[in-house]
Amino acid sequence: MELKLKSISPSSIGAAIAKAERYRFLNEPEEAESICRDILAVDPLHQMAQRILGLSITDQFTGGAKDRFNEAAEIFTALEEEYARSYYTGILHERHAKAQLRAGRPAQAISAELEEAMHHFENAERLRGRANDEAILRWNRCARLLETIPRPQSMEENVFESEEIPSHPSHHATAARVGRHH
């Protein structure tokens, strides 16, 4: 049996958007994604449906190779408003970083992803309307999350912090200069 998807009527798009948002809030992103695809089949440029579709895809991120990062990126970069493109691309990178963090990925990859998100949020902040602090709130969250991720120490710090350095008179002088005594 061949299955052919049925089309919704253009007059029901508003109710369908509300239903897609509700499914996202119920943590059922696959349902929201399906509804958005039905809306976009009728109105391919519907901005709210595109936003919810992209967010629904990011809701499904697990930090694995099967995450549909590129698909969500294409959706967000196709948004009409420059502010929306920057803001939602920032969310894409932030959510990707959080999924990688939950999956135990290396700190360097997570840090780079959060920094990319912050770059997009800074751009959105410059483009924002009056009384719209969404981008600032997201930037601050990324900054706080970055503070919790261990940073690799520089080579110089590793030398001075290592307890395995053999005792040598010049070592004691160096340790004294940096404020560390044995």
Residue spans for each PLM region:
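Structural marker of alpha-solenoid helical repeat scaffolds
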Residues: 42, 75-79, 127
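Terminal, low-structured helical/coil segments at or just beyond the last alpha-helical repeat
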Residues: 2-4, 126, 131-182
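N-terminal interaction modules that seed assembly of large macromolecular complexes
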Residues: 25-61
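Amphipathic alpha-helical repeat scaffolds of TPR domains
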Residues: 10-15, 43-57, 80-103, 133-145
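Short coil/linker segments at helix-helix boundaries
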Residues: 57-78, 88-123, 148-162
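TPR-adjacent "capping" and linker segments in tetratricopeptide-repeat scaffold/adaptor proteins
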Residues: 1-15, 76-77, 108
